[in-house]
Design a protein with these regions (language model features):
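C-terminal structured "cap/appendage" subdomains that terminate the fold
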Residues: 479-523
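Active/binding-pocket-proximal capping segment
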Residues: 307-320, 451-485, 520-523, 532-537
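Extended terminal and domain-junction accessory segments
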Residues: 8-9, 17-49, 110, 115-131, ...
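A conserved hydrophobic secondary-structure block that centers on an alpha-helix together
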Residues: 171-188
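Short strand-edge motifs at loop-to-beta-strand transitions and within beta-strands
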Residues: 174-178, 279, 328, 336-340, ...
Length: 544
């Protein structure tokens, strides 16, 4: 059967059954938020074995089967210091789950609609089905190969460092070795898989864990006395019948779950904190705690609110501030981290939630999402709050040598004949192509332009950046932090908007890496580009 015959047949039959909209998972709550296990460096070295395994776990009173790091959800917190050598032996022991295994399963692959009449996802699905039909033998490989990314660490992208182009097959091991620079800012980073086309599937399983770089901010007297909590927010998509993460195509819609699946897989979305659903976080009245929060979400932005409390932010994406900045709420796009101090108010129970937010999906915003409960009780205390912190990194006083424009676009209609696509400069990701070439030791400004209805949180590997201009913020949207001195490694691109970032390519790190949308289904569908960092003085173009 050729492609034309197949498409005609599927169109005539209505592309089989309709896609079911996943429901919000039933939750349990009331348990105290648990601390994650931690592993710390000693004598300048952290040597750790990370087993990627498929194992049963309990999630909200339900037995599920997930891919995990060492059987834990999420993985252990790795504590290191600037100048350390971080050695991770990654062992791939994934057992494939949730994969289409025969043509009977795959025939009902395409169906139905999104919740917005402007988007004809059926046509896109037909093309995607055909592409997968032609390469269906690779589906299992896409699901069970893996690798590792140390998100935010300013380390070499070359082997044995943060090489995201590696493909580590089942029963294979790989020894990573990361030389953490002596000037790595002290703060919160994280690790997760980065195998292109399967990244979303693996992070939906909960494959993630925090990396804490200790340093000067930890010695601030008031902070040193505080209770510290590291909180990983996962977003987990679990099928109702198999209790596994489905391996299917997804198309965006509105509602509790941000997409429909092809083939239709009735499923529920769970958003646990440290592997727990709706936990309690207990504090004494007047107590100040330091919270480190990572949005290890493949898709959803977390507009974090704590009812009745101010969040005194002390760092973003691992890089500290000079002084605390009080905020009524903090927006965490997928992959962002925020560190803040919270001082408990009067005794009582206070909601911790992600406020309803419109990421640009057809049909409207994601609804409000409860995350946890702050429980204030016990003896009154009065924890001191710091007024100053540490000197943050400064942008070097160098000229901007080059200015570039990158255009981000998407198509979920299938009208291009290429299926569901997310593109940069009109191109899907190609590992063999160099999309952008830069010179270490220089500063560039990039203007990112969004021709899409969706927000795209753009992540650049290795080097953080500062945002100097944002245009197109939706009217009335108060979630944006546009302070020009804040450093980011992931920043949201407004729908049909743009922003300009300024980035210093540190002189001691060269090699090939990537930049991409951190809505991981978008990255898997093509919205990623390759970045080659040349040694200083060896940029082939010479001057600007």
């Amino acid at each position: 059967m050729n492609r034309r015959t197949f498409l005609a047949l599927m169109a005539a039959t209505g592309a089989a059954g309709a896609v079911g909209n996943a429901s919000t998972a039933a939750h349990v709550g009331g348990e105290e938020l648990r601390d994650l296990p931690e592993v710390s460096s000693a004598n300048g070295i952290l040597d750790y074995e990370l087993n990627v395994v498929t194992n049963p776990l309990e999630l909200g009173g339900r037995q599920v089967t997930l891919e995990t790091y060492n059987g834990q959800l999420p993985g252990a917190a790795l504590r290191i210091r600037p100048g350390d050598n971080l050695r991770i032996l990654l062992k791939n022991r994934i057992v494939p789950v949730g994969i289409p295994t025969n043509d009977v399963f795959m025939l009902p692959y395409c169906a139905s609609k999104s919740n917005d009449a402007r988007y004809d996802t059926r046509r896109a699905c037909l093309h995607d089905f055909w592409n997968r039909w032609e390469r269906r033998q690779t589906l299992a490989q896409e699901a069970i190969d893996t690798n590792l990314h140390t998100h935010g660490l300013q380390v070499s992208p070359q082997d044995p460092g943060d090489n995201v182009f590696l493909q580590i097959g089942p029963l294979n091991d790989h020894q990573y070795s990361y030389d953490v620079p002596t000037d790595q800012p002290a703060g919160l980073y994280w690790y997760h898989p980065h195998f292109h086309t399967a990244t979303a599937h693996q992070v939906w399983n909960g494959l993630s864990g925090p990396i804490i770089v200790e340093g000067d901010i930890d010695a601030v007297p008031e902070i040193a006395e505080m209770r510290e909590r590291t909180i990983v927010i996962n977003e987990m998509w679990i099928a109702d019948d198999s209790a596994e993460v489905p391996f299917t195509l997804v198309a965006p819609v509105a509602g509790p779950v941000p997409f429909v699946s092809f083939p239709s897989v009735p499923a529920a979305m769970y958003v646990p904190l440290n592997g727990q659903l709706l936990p309690d976080i207990t504090m004494q009245p007047g107590e100040a705690q330091r919270w480190r929060v990572v949005a290890a979400t493949p898709h959803r932005s977390i507009w974090l609110h704590v009812e009745g409390h101010t969040l005194h932010q002390i760092g973003t994406d691992g890089i500290p501030y000079a002084s605390p900045r009080p905020r009524p709420h903090i927006m965490l796009a997928a992959a962002n981290r925020a560190e803040f101090i919270i001082k408990a108010g009067e005794p009582g129970r206070y909601r911790i939630y992600a406020e309803a937010y419109d990421q640009g999906h057809p049909g409207g915003p994601r609804p409000r999402l409860p995350l946890a409960t702050l429980v204030v009780r016990g003896k009154q205390v009065n924890s001191p709050m710091p007024s100053t912190l540490v000197e943050p990194p400064r942008m070097p006083d160098l000229p901007v040598v080059r200015r570039r424009t990158l255009v981000f676009s998407g198509d979920i209609t299938g009208r291009t004949g290429m299926g569901i696509q997310f593109l940069i400069d009109g191109k899907e990701m190609d590992h063999e192509r160099i999309d952008t070439e830069v010179e270490a030791g220089t500063i560039e400004e990039w203007t990112l332009v969004n021709e899409d209805i969706f927000q795209h949180p753009i992540h650049i590997h290795v080097n953080p950046f500062q945002v100097v201009d944002v245009q197109g913020i939706p009217p009335g949207d108060t979630s944006w932090n546009t302070e020009p001195d804040v450093w980011w490694d992931t920043f949201r691109l407004p729908p049909f908007g743009r922003y300009t970032l300024r980035m210093y390519f540190r002189p001691d790190i060269t090699g090939k890496t990537v930049y991409h949308c951190h809505i991981l289904p978008h990255e898997d569908r093509g919205m990623m580009g390759t970045l080659l960092i040349d040694p200083h003085g060896q940029y082939p173009g010479g001057g600007p």
